[in-house]
Amino acid sequence: MELTNSLGLLLGSSWASGINLYLTVAGLGIAHRMGWIVLPGNMDTLAHPLVIGVAMLVYAVEFIADKIPFVDSAWDSVHTFIRPAGGMALGYLAMVDAGPAVQYPVAVLTGAIALDSHLTKATSRAAINTSPEPFTNTIASVTEDAGVIGALYLIVKHPVIVSLLVILFIVFSVWFLKNMFRFLKRVLKGKNTRPTAELAGHSFKP
């Protein structure tokens, strides 16, 4: 693969893995089998029918779980290790022919990108769950899946564009995560202090 194509594949797939690992794996595998893209190294393992089938099956479970308030956050918590590990695996498989000197750093990089997109997703979902509106989770979930599908399309058709978008996302996520952690901290602090304040108010009643 050309450098731009390889970079687009690595950056795009690692970002998408942090959002929805199973849809990413299935999408890349199908794209390879259809001849839309040639996956490098041992990454063509994703095109095995069993891998695609298992990925689609687990994606079906995630498709439902991801739209239920608080269940989505529990699912994200479980995947805090799985999604970055999946991103690392994709980088490792793609660079198997380049040797350990390249393979390991690339795997760490793709894992870090997957962790970044996962934390952004998980944090935004935790913030959304503070809202009583039940349809917000569904909208967020559909938007995320659409983003993954869009990233897979750009990996195949416009690798340079997906590379630039991932870089911009990383820059944005630094600001976003910083502010969202502050927001969630204030929300949790408010929930913890409210009962104490109410108890104190009752204790001083005559």
Task: Go through the PLM ranges and name each one.
Residues A85-L93, Q103-T123, A146:
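Mid-bilayer segments of alpha-helical transmembrane spans in multi-pass integral membrane proteins
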Residues S73-A85, P105-A107, P132, T136-T138:
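Cytoplasmic-side transmembrane-helix entry/capping segments in multi-pass membrane proteins
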Residues A60-S73, T120-N129:
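C-terminal ends of transmembrane helices
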Residues M1-N5, A31-P49, G91-V106, L154-S163:
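Helix-coil boundary and interhelical linker segments in multi-pass alpha-helical membrane proteins
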Residues G12, A89-A94, K121-A127, V148-V156:
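Generic transmembrane alpha-helix signature in multi-pass membrane proteins
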Residues T80-Y92, T136-G150, T196-H202:
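Small-residue-rich segments of transmembrane alpha-helices in multi-pass membrane proteins
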Residues M43-L50, M95-P105, A122-P134, F181-R194:
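A cytosolic-side transmembrane-helix exit/cap motif
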Residues S17-L21, D44-A55, H79-P84:
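Helical membrane-embedded segments and adjacent short helical loop/helix-boundary regions
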